[in-house]
């Protein structure tokens, strides 16, 4: 493990050595490089970074972060569960935001028992939600297009990391007029475990060819924040429907009221 960690770090120096030498000076650069050469246990967390040197990838959650669809999920979960003779409060349904399999199965089994007809209920929930979105359309969250345009102007790659399946993700982004901003979509259907497990963000980092610590994740829900943080990404949160608790806040580099405010912060740090 140490040898592998040291290899990653040495590759980092090969790629970014010129920038590090220019920023920190030849003496400090060589001292760090020589230490890594003889000590495989040194990881990238111990290597000084140049601000923004490879911070060129941002992962966006979709529902509740870029588009205003979480409110529909919340209503439809409650309605679909009631349709099958069970009850859930809107507050309890918030725990389902971005929750991927097998976590969602566990949620319903623990709450209602093994006989709960999850697959039938979920199919009904999807049906009524599609009817609502067809009726109302999809609203883009305030500041979404502005932050995407700004990131693109800086040649910063934008990718989707969502719990929604690929077909609906592509359709929703098209309906919202956001498809052209994204280089790639990572969906929960592409990994074994969805959020709050880190799998989605681990795959996103792999696709981007970047280490997690060099990637930013933007999320709206606690499950999404936990997934991104567990993968090792820099996490920023734009809360939707409710405010995060202290445990969730502690996982974030910043919590902002809107994507507009986050963009203003990015102007300072990227």
Label for each model-derived stretch:
Residues 66, 140, 158-161, 193, ...:
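Conserved SAM-binding loop
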Residues 87, 157, 234:
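Residue-level detector of anion-binding/catalytic polar loops
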Residues 9, 18, 23-26, 31:
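Ala/Thr-enriched low-complexity intrinsically disordered regions
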Residues 56-154, 167:
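N-terminal helical cap/lid subdomain that shapes the substrate entry/recognition surface
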Residues 32-54:
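Short, Lys/Arg-enriched N-terminal segments with co-localized hydrophobic residues
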Residues 3, 9, 17, 39-42, ...:
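Short hydrophobic alpha-helical segments enriched in small aliphatic residues
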Residues 43, 54-56, 149-152, 165-270:
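Asp-based, Mg2+/Mn2+-dependent phosphohydrolase catalytic module
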